[in-house]
Amino acid sequence: MGRMHSPTFDGRHTRFVLTAFFVRQIMALAGFALLATIALGIAALATWNVADPSLSYATGNQPTNLLGYSGAIFADIVMQFLGLSAIIAFLPIIAWAIALIAGRKFNRIPARLVAWVAGAIVCAASLGCFPAPVTWPLPNGIGGVIGDMILRFPALFIGAYPTGTIATILGVIFAAPAAWLMLFAAGIVGGLDDELEREEAVPVATSKARAAREAEEDDEDDGEGFFANMLAFGAIAHYWYITQARLRRLFGLKSKSLHTEFEHPYDFNEYEFGTLNEPSRLKTAINRLDQRSEPSFEERAASRRQMSPPSIALDHDNNADDEPPFDADGRRLPNGILSDDESDDKFTPRQAPGRGQPRITAPSARPKPSERVAREAQASFIAADGFQLPTVHLLAEPKNVVRDNTLSEEVLEQNARLLEGVLEDFGVKGEIIHVRPGPVVTLYELEPAPGIKSSRVIGLADDIARSMSAIAARVAVVPGRNAIGIELPNQTRETVFLRELVGSRDFENSKAKLAMALGKTIGGEPVIADLAKMPHLLVAGTTGSGKSVAINTMILSLIYRMSPEQCRLIMIDPKMLELSIYDGIPHLLSPVVTDPKKAVVALKWTVREMEERYKKMSKIGVRNIDGFNSRVQQALDKGEILTRTVQTGFDRQTGEAMYETEEFDLKPLPYIVVIIDEMADLMMVAGKDIEGAVQRLAQMARAAGIHVIMATQRPSVDVITGTIKANFPTRISFQVTSKIDSRTILGEQGAEQLLGMGDMLYMAGGGRIQRVHGPFVSDNEVEEIVAYLKTQGSPEYLEAITEEEDEDGAGSGPAGAGNFSDSEDPYDQAVAVVLRDGKASTSYVQRRLGIGYNRAASLIERMEQEGIIGPANHAGKREILVPTEADIIER
């Protein structure tokens, strides 16, 4: 009788089965690891950007690659050497990973590796034969450096790199061996297990007899392989459960989740009725779920479902509802778990905003760089014609600022709860529904309880700042929402740089005519405003609040998008410090005006230019500057000449109407932006003239393409008058010293709570106020940009902007003094007054003509220069050197 072998305890084949099982699992894990590595490589290639920092291109920009610096370096190396053939080189590796996962073995592994390398090289040569597209950013071909190197060998025979038909033929010739090598490397050609099966065929045939004899000796070993496999799986499962139990005991974990415990707290059988009468277990689970609960209000309690502790009623009520009640999540519970009657132990579940919809909003990412940044990163050796806009690389790169740990979700959640407690201490009930961290401040949106006035919460700004240990706190109503925004400064403030705004896609793709990068919102989104729609801007703030830096950023924003043919600038800087650095750039219509007297003349010239533009537009029949330029451009493209036929009179002999054809000057009109850095100084010197000119420009200059940016550091009512405020609907307020100044600029308080250094409140035309953090630009950056602009061309100044009109009225002599009063020139009228009345003083001319003191003084000085009156004596009186009207009458 043969010996019996137990499949459970016989280990003859058990070790072999376990070894094969573990080898199979290791191969599968290796396949998955290889597949994950391929996915990372493909992700790095898919997000490859030529402007990312790499071994061949050094820059401080943040890498846009999905894998960061390592992905950018990997993608750059692969694309530089292999080009687009790198994508094809990944295909055999994917086949290897799939084969490993399926448990298939490889034969001739060294040969397949060599075939893979050779196939990648030949594929690069094949792609290098084809011309690169226009958008290809690398200097070599689409086959990379390797493809160009291989193409040098045909160049030795034909004398140059192959192009045209020869290149296409070579590409097709190279494609055939490249495809075969890749298929062989992937195992598609030659098979993976063919030779292994042939090599194992002979040993298998010779062992059939021995296997038959062994089968005859042990007939009961037929199912041994099955039991061995079961033994292997059983051993693995056994050790897995042991390890899992040890981990639970080590870390104090429980087998059932809290959610399962709350859903099915008890098993309803005859042995657990005594346990059901004890509601402590359910209360404990509910309390754990309610650890993060927000304050609830009495008004909301009626609309929420109420849940009572579980109690099992052994005596069922016949009048009970047939349908069992539901819990707070809508699940049907057994009868008796929820009581229909209210009890003392009843509680109301309060849903925290973090459940389902988290109230902590993730900070916004940096603005995505535009195509302009990548385009300017590649140096061009071909000189461009015409005016070239300044490159973004002239601006300072934004620093890599690490997010402050105070902006983590735990800290923000703790601050939200602390703020709720502070408000409750002051008698304000509410809950923080959203927390929006930003680069400078964090916005906490408070949803007040019904009956709480917003003015009451706004008045607690100083108390909130004191209780939260903050420098300042701004409280305002969030437009369009039932929420009050509480803005608290961050401990670590991030600097907003102009480069990340000018180089962003939002700025490049903006459809604004006169786009200006104002800064970032509280959440970190870029703010791009259109000066053409404002149409004028009033900027106010104390010294050191960032007002001058903001003016520089506005000017640079216009310069980075507009050429001198599209936009011209008139700069008025009575302080002679801020805008004088721009003197000499091609965009200027006149040198930077620093004399207040010439500033008045420049504004009056702007008014006359506005009127001339309106005349031109009315003749052509358009309504604004865009329509005028469009009509002119259409005529230039078609080679036409715009004409207009007007009636000039009637023929005396025939009485027929006479017409004349008038031709127009076909020249597009540029936008004109007038920038006044300090309005207070101009108002002190010539307040009446300045206010009148600014009023006319603000009321009428929008359609003519003339816009005014006016800044002042003294936002008082004598500088920002009611007339100016009525014509400047768009305003920006930086930090001010008092609530009165804030109300003067914006019509409400809040600007006194700003942090300075570019922190502003931006009020658009509709009256909506938005907090914006202005970008920073240094003097060195401005100087570099100005130096670059000066190399692009010299400015074409108009002398008439700063020169007063001279109507040759004084040359007619004293004999014509009686006709001076009929002239419209103020100088002629002043001479007529002096010669008629015999009094030559500034105050007398001012009083008689109704003009400003400075204007009258300039007229008196001009009379002295032309010899009509003499210089003032020690008493301030002047002698009239020409005969007066009284002298002429006596003669």
Curated annotation (Swiss-Prot):
- Entry-linked Pfam families: FtsK_4TM (PF13491), FtsK_alpha (PF17854), FtsK_gamma (PF09397), FtsK_SpoIIIE (PF01580)
Q: Residues annotated as region Disordered?
A: 286-373, 804-824
Ranges annotated as biased composition (Basic and acidic residues): 289-302
Task: Just give the chief location class.
Answer: membrane
| SMART domains the record matches | AAA, Ftsk_gamma
What's the domain of life for this entry? Bacteria
Its recorded name reads DNA translocase FtsK
* Gene name as annotated: ftsK
